[in-house]
Amino acid sequence: WTSCKIGFRSIEIKNREMLINGMPVLIQGVNRHEHDPVSGKTVSRESMLEDIVLMKKYNFNAVRCAHYPNDPHWYELCDEYGIYVVDEANIETHHYYGRLCREPEWTNAFLDRTRRMVETNKNHPSIIMWSLGNESGYGPNHAACAGWIRERDSSRLLHYEGALRPEFQGDWKPDAGFNSFATDVVAPMYPTINDIVEWVKTSKDKRPLIMCEYSHAMGNSNGSLSDYWDAILNNHGLQGGFIWDWVDQGLDPEGNEKWKYGGDFGDKPNDANFCINGLVWPNRKPHPAMYEFKKLVQPVHADAIDLEMGKLELFNRRYFTALEDIFLEWRLEIDGSTVQKGTIKTLKANPRNKMQIRLNLKKPEVLIGQEVYLYLCY
């Protein structure tokens, strides 16, 4: 036996929303592989903490453990710092996508990995969903795992993308209630924006839609992030998702910031650059999409009421915390030069509430053709 910290929270589905402690928290998530550029899959506690601090800094609030249970320290840190976790069983059968899950001789192997995940990590309140695995089709073996989890732990939700897409590379099934025994959320992988908006309009499914994977971050990508989040913020039933994925999995054993992958060690066969699809470099330096995501989901949203009078309306997007810990710095620029600036040190808006502020803004002298911008920094 060993001691561990515990916590209390409630998770339930009501009216197309996943409620955490009664609030429909948007999932601002990312998929994360365990990876260190020097030690590979052996990740230190310090490296894990670096990831969590960076995620919090860029407004991520959730992680899917893709595609296996993580080091025990990871869950302890998520409990402490406030990251929601989808814990995933170490089940993935790409080439045999719809086969192993339907063969009785594999049932115990499926159940063993599922039980081990739940029994090992059940005391961590940061875990809000158990995932039955990744891209493994759907069959009786998944149903057995789902049944065991529902009997063992009714305090959390079930998540499994494969229950909505039983055929490899097939279309996901948006039918109301399709395979709802195996997943409490509609969790498609790489749906188009039109797909998810049409689902809102046409499906009678009472579950929320939380994308299992979207906005694949390989190469020059993530180009539709703002369009996805416009859809999420404006359609009841869409509750966020998990970007694929967190870190480029390059290796730098010599410490010279030349990351190797996909044949650089003379390894054949290899997957070329298919492990280089992260939002951050192997050394955790952010790619440009990180800055865009941070802006899209920032905890304060501003609307102009009367710019000449300096009147703005702020909306606190947080679900459990007021704005007293945040101050506002603003500046007015004309053609890139700051002409006015100021600070509002006290913001008072309860969770999911609005407030009005007035900037000490004087009407500037603007010549024809000049560009004027008001910048807000929280």
Task: Give the residues covered by each predicted segment.
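Intrinsically disordered, low-complexity Pro/Gly/Ser/Thr-rich segments with frequent PxxP/GP/PP motifs
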Residues: 327-375
